[in-house]
Amino acid sequence: MGSRSSHAAVIPDGDSIRRETGFSQASLLRLHHRFRALDRNKKGYLSRMDLQQIGALAVNPLGDRIIESFFPDGSQRVDFPGFVRVLAHFRPVEDEDTETQDPKKPEPLNSRRNKLHCEFVRTCTNAFQLYDLDRDGKISRHEMLQVLRLMVGVQVTEEQLENIADRTVQEADEDGDGAVSFVEFTKSLEKMDVEQKMSIRILK
Amino acid sequence: MLRAALSLLALPLAGAAEEPTQKPESPGEPPPGLELFRWQWHEVEAPYLVALWILVASLAKIVFHLSRKVTSLVPESCLLILLGLVLGGIVLAVAKKAEYQLEPGTFFLFLLPPIVLDSGYFMPSRLFFDNLGAILTYAVVGTLWNAFTTGAALWGLQQAGLVAPRVQAGLLDFLLFGSLISAVDPVAVLAVFEEVHVNETLFIIVFGESLLNDAVTVVLYKVCNSFVEMGSANVQATDYLKGVASLFVVSLGGAAVGLVFAFLLALTTRFTKRVRIIEPLLVFLLAYAAYLTAEMASLSAILAVTMCGLGCKKYVEANISHKSRTTVKYTMKTLASCAETVIFMLLGISAVDSSKWAWDSGLVLGTLIFILFFRALGVVLQTWVLNQFRLVPLDKIDQVVMSYGGLRGAVAFALVILLDRTKVPAKDYFVATTIVVVFFTVIVQGLTIKPLVKWLKVKRSEHHKPTLNQELHEHTFDHILAAVEDVVGHHGYHYWRDRWEQFDKKYLSQLLMRRSAYRIRDQIWDVYYRLNIRDAISFVDQGGHVLSSTGLTLPSMPSRNSVAETSVTNLLRESGSGACLDLQVIDTVRSGRDREDAVMHHLLCGGLYKPRRRYKASCSRHFISEDAQERQDKEVFQQNMKRRLESFKSTKHNICFTKSKPRPRKTGRRKKDGVANAEATNGKHRGLGFQDTAAVILTVESEEEEEESDSSETEKEDDEGIIFVARATSEVLQEGKVSGSLEVCPSPRIIPPSPTCAEKELPWKSGQGDLAVYVSSETTKIVPVDMQTGWNQSISSLESLASPPCNQAPILTCLPPHPRGTEEPQVPLHLPSDPRSSFAFPPSLAKAGRSRSESSADLPQQQELQPLMGHKDHTHLSPGTATSHWCIQFNRGSRL
């Protein structure tokens, strides 16, 4: 951690990134540190290989998809601003509208609800993109099947898996088009206490 | 101790018992020879009294719940304490001295463990670990804070002269008192919060705290107690260090003991495949052993049992059979609720003991105020710290509820009773104060917390059904977060949870779960499985609704629907396929599902006619003989089959008869008969039943080909009927086997020639024949879409096979006596499935379902099914033709 001060100078466009993503200086430093650690050959960007080398990610059933989300539009590399931008999706929302948030000063209920709603929508977006591989704004049965194949750990046959996929799509599908749209997706998430489920506290 | 405590419950009995008990004990007398009658009260006294007390407590509970109004306003614990007060008063008045108090020994060894086990076992583990940080903070820091501040403040109060000088206590005594009075009590918290239904997070924090603070309480109490006994002068610096160290030893040791026993328990249940009957016992035995072991090593016993329950649940539930699971659940709940009831009642009784009361207003008031004040202060301070780290901060309202929910209870009381009067001269004052505090928190706070929660609009817990989407998304979220933490390089909570889950999957589950259980252990799969079964049931339900909405409303409809529903539900439940139908029952929240189940159960009990019983000598102690229910099912089935066989035979003969008769007359009779019957059944087109269609089919298959053709020529309706039967069945089954089905004579084949594998596995099915197999294959495979087709078939077949005449159907019961009366009641049974046939799925789907279903004896089975599937033809008939048509069939079927 002694090298922290030296890093501060190194971050290119540190301020603009911070403004864009809302990360604090400390987290940005931490991320930059991490970025450089992942960047094996000091090439200044990360390739898929770099991320695939994270051990725990390899066992994660969704690891590949998470990695993929760092490389939009099929690009081969991600630089630091891009890296941070992706991670910003997982930052707890509170910073923007509650810069001065303090237990002493309770915000009006409305704004809190607003905030929760923001967070909810953002969470949904995050998750939705993970399902929607072809980016057509819908989770088709095929896409659902792929996710399920990753997620269901037990030995089920392909046929059973298809049945589960059918069932899952049917459950969420309200307009009967055989696919889950974003609106339908958010509806299926409404019952869960989502707001706390898609943020990582450390990314403040 | 229990014996001592309860020995005088016999007061009402005493008069009766007194005299006879003297007899056998009077010494010196020569033995009076053979006694015809001997009164041995003393030999049964202790257990008898225990049983009596529990009975009294249970009866009291029943009485309380007779009035919904009272229980919705007043928590049960309050009522029980008040009842205890009354009972104690009576005992005091009769015996002139207080008896049957809450003995610490009884409390800690017998009454507390079931409650803690219950709460540990049914603790929502995910929620618990998600909030573990907060829980631990409140449990450890909070309890320490409460103990020290309360003790010190009381001491300050004494120094200020506000406590009467006759309370001889030093700082250490007050700290000791503070340590025992500061702990939030799990029993009281559970009793009150279970009725309040605050949101899950709040509940788990308060409740988890009350469970985990036991370790702190035990340590504090023991340390202070030994300090007091040593005398403050002799306490050395190392003793303080030892005190701190013992906190870790007691808590971690207790948890370790619990986990070890959880491991043992899980491992043991892995090998109980052949002795299912002792599975529930194992759970209780090993958990209790954990408690006793921890108690023996003077570790935190509550922590041990909590961890044991928490740790073993996943594996035990996967290992033990479905029935054992239900048994464990109910036994645990019963024991816990029983213990809780007795505790509160005895608490009430214990308060009526004038010898205990050494009142000091300053001490009592001071304690009450300090407890409330420091609890609130502690909660606010800790929450402030915690909120710096929590993603979802605990807001003000939560804090109020948490402060106010700090109830004290029987643990504090038992601890204060355990004090040694010679070492702690102020014991009596402490006891009195504790009683007041306990009563105040349980009664006043318990009474007011519900209105408070309502008034503050605390987020309530909402219970919703699990959906596949939620389950799936929850898992995805976990994985996403773990992955992001990996990328960020921060090893936080999600990271470790992910690690743990992988470890669990790789090693622990493999070691502790049965192979068969391990293979199918997946939460998404689980939810899917349950959802399907629920859907199946609700589909059957819906079938009824759809039916009534199509305009075919008949008075007997609902009852018949329910018959179908119950029989299917029942079959499913009996199938032992490992599925729990009662999704909600698993949770502690009572829901409408239970009631629904109960209603169904009663309906079934009332609706099924009681078959002749065959008494089998089944007295194996190690294996449960098949249920009465199963036996009944079998009997019903057999009787139905017998009847059907007869009816088939008789219809054959009938056909010969009818053929020889002149047409016009026949139609006339047909009409008349039909009208009579239809009128009897309720004046609508109710004559339809599978017998009739079966009869039609039989006409086709009967040997007299020429007569058959003759009838088809002359009678349009008949002809139509035949055609439709054939087409409908072929449509449903998509096999083009119509002619085959017509050639097959169903009666001899009704019992399948060779048992399918499902039959071998599930013995109860053997009696049900192929149809049951059909159902089971559908349910275990769980095919979502085409399941409906399967259900159509199985339901219709089940109906015709297993549904007996229901006495709730007024029409059925008021049928006029008929020549072939035995068949009559069954005649209308087939109607409700008609609309269901309109649910028929596209042929391809139906086919897929079939191919997936049990294929061993498939084709013959289908063919056998066809007579039963006759209802399909109904959909093709216009009402007008239907009427006359049914009449004809009816006539045939019922003629002798």
Swiss-Prot record, chain B:
It comes from the Eukaryota. GO terms for biological process: monoatomic ion transport; potassium ion transmembrane transport; regulation of intracellular pH; sodium ion import across plasma membrane; sodium ion transmembrane transport. InterPro entries: Cation/H_exchanger_CPA1, Cation/H_exchanger_TM, Na/H_exchanger_3/5, NaH_exchanger. The keyword Cell membrane applies. Residues 1-45, 95-103, 156-173, 222-246, 298-331, 382-398, 450-896 are cytoplasmic. Mainly expressed in brain. Expressed in neurons of the central and peripheral nervous system. Expressed also in testis, spleen, and skeletal muscle. GO terms for cellular component: dendritic spine membrane; focal adhesion; membrane; neuron spine; plasma membrane; postsynaptic membrane; recycling endosome membrane; synapse. It catalyses: Na(+)(in) + H(+)(out) = Na(+)(out) + H(+)(in). Residues 576-721 are annotated as: Required for interaction with ARRB2. Residues 854-864 have a biased composition (Polar residues). Changing residue 702 to D: Abolishes SLC9A5 phosphorylation by CSNK2A1 and abolishes CSNK2A1-mediated binding of ARRB2. Signal peptide: none annotated. Phosphorylated by PRKAA2; promotes its accumulation at the cell surface. Phosphorylated by CSNK2A1 in a manner favoring its beta-arrestin binding and endocytosis. The keyword Transmembrane helix applies. Pfam families: Na_H_Exchanger. ATP-depletion almost completely abolishes SLC9A5 activity. Inhibited by amiloride compounds. Plasma membrane Na(+)/H(+) antiporter. Mediates the electroneutral exchange of intracellular H(+) ions for extracellular Na(+) in 1:1 stoichiometry, thus regulating intracellular pH homeostasis, in particular in neural tissues. Acts as a negative regulator of dendritic spine growth. Plays a role in postsynaptic remodeling and signaling. Can also contribute to organellar pH regulation, with consequences for receptor tyrosine kinase trafficking. Interacts with CHP1 and CHP2. Interacts with ARRB2; facilitates the endocytosis of SLC9A5 from the plasma membrane. Interacts with RACK1; this interaction positively regulates SLC9A5 activity and promotes SLC9A5 localization to focal adhesions. Interacts with SCAMP2; this interaction regulates SLC9A5 cell-surface targeting and SLC9A5 activity. PANTHER family: SODIUM/HYDROGEN EXCHANGER, SODIUM_HYDROGEN EXCHANGER 5. This is Sodium/hydrogen exchanger 5. It comes from Homo sapiens (Human). The gene is SLC9A5.
